[in-house]
Design a protein with these regions (language model features):
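Alpha/beta-hydrolase fold catalytic core
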Residues: 1-16, 36-40, 75-77, 179, ...
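Active-site loop/oxyanion-hole signature of alpha/beta-hydrolase fold enzymes
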Residues: 29, 33-36, 42-81, 243-246
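Flexible "cap/lid" loop of the alpha/beta hydrolase fold
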Residues: 91-95, 102-134
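Active-site glycine-rich loops that stabilize anionic/oxyanionic intermediates
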Residues: 20-23, 84
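Conserved alpha/beta-hydrolase catalytic His-Asp/Glu region
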Residues: 131-187
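Conserved serine/cysteine hydrolase catalytic core
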Residues: 164-217, 222-225
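Gly/Ala-rich beta-loop-alpha elbow adjacent to hydrolase catalytic centers
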Residues: 82, 86, 90
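Catalytic active-site module of serine/aspartate enzymes centered on a nucleophile-bearing elbow/loop
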Residues: 221-255
Length: 255
């Protein structure tokens, strides 16, 4: 079963957080802890990420089935926040198993196939000689030769296990399955629960032309934009993201 971290009282409404590509539940620690005064927060590590098991496949049906296993083991019907790849996994989960999901907040991703590639970051991580890395800043410095964005450098090194000098990412499988990650499966189901598609103002991941397919799958879809934020909106504007999540899950009518 997937690894997950929990915050808050089990008696509170459950909220599952699903990270994006190259991330982990731990990346969401600050937001998860802050939301734990209102929710029982479950932050999962998706397959081939963090402390969860590694598998030879990385498709959205498999990821959704992994999430079903966690949800049923906890006997909950959670609200869900899913970012990027995690948002796609959350959408597939809701479309295939609508009775298991309460409300969805999909952060900066649409149920469509994207043409851009994220494999360059895998190659960057592969180029790091981890035998010479003694502290996280060593890896950050080494990554800076291949990844210009400082925030991304720090983000990637959060998935570095210093004790074993290895990545907590199944880079080989993520590379070979990149076509699955960038795509989105055809699903006949619909989700009639409240769903917020929350985009970063500076991001192009949720575009106007995506609304037709979104509305056809998510009957109660709503849209909001976080001003000044890009694709990593929860990291760039954490307080604003947190406040929007609270409003959506507790006071939906404001949207």
């Amino acid at each position: 079963m997937l690894n997950y971290l929990t915050h808050g009282a089990e008696s509170s409404p459950p909220l599952m957080i699903i990270h994006g590509l190259y991330g982990s539940g731990r990346n969401w620690g600050v937001i998860a802890k802050r939301l734990s005064n209102q929710f029982y927060v479950i932050s999962v590590d998706l397959r081939n990420h963090g402390d969860s098991p590694w598998f030879a496949s990385h498709d959205y049906h498999s990821m959704a089935n992994d999430l079903v296993e966690v949800i049923t083991s906890l006997d909950i019907r959670p609200n869900i926040i899913g970012h990027s790849m995690g948002g796609k996994a959350a959408m597939v989960l809701a479309l295939k198993n609508p009775d298991l999901v309460n409300r969805l907040l999909i952060a900066d991703i649409a149920p469509v196939k994207y043409e851009h590639d994220q494999s360059q970051f895998i190659e960057a991580m592969r180029k790091i000689d981890l035998s010479k890395v003694e502290k996280r800043s060593d890896a950050t410095e080494a990554l800076s030769k291949f990844v210009e964005n400082k925030s991304l450098q720090n983000f990637f090194t959060q998935s570095l296990d210093l004790k074993t000098k290895s990545w907590k990412l199944n880079l080989d499988i993520l590379s070979s399955q990149m076509h699955e990650i960038l795509g989105f499966p055809k699903i006949d189901g619909k989700f009639s629960g409240h769903t917020l598609f929350f985009r970063g103002e500076k991001s192009e991941y949720i575009r106007a032309e995506h609304r037709e397919i979104i509305n056809s799958l998510f009957i109660k879809a709503r849209f909001a934009t976080l001003k000044g934020a890009g694709h990593w909106l929860h990291a760039e504007k954490p307080r604003e993201f947190e406040n929007a999540a609270r409003l959506f899950f507790k006071e939906l009518e404001r949207f």
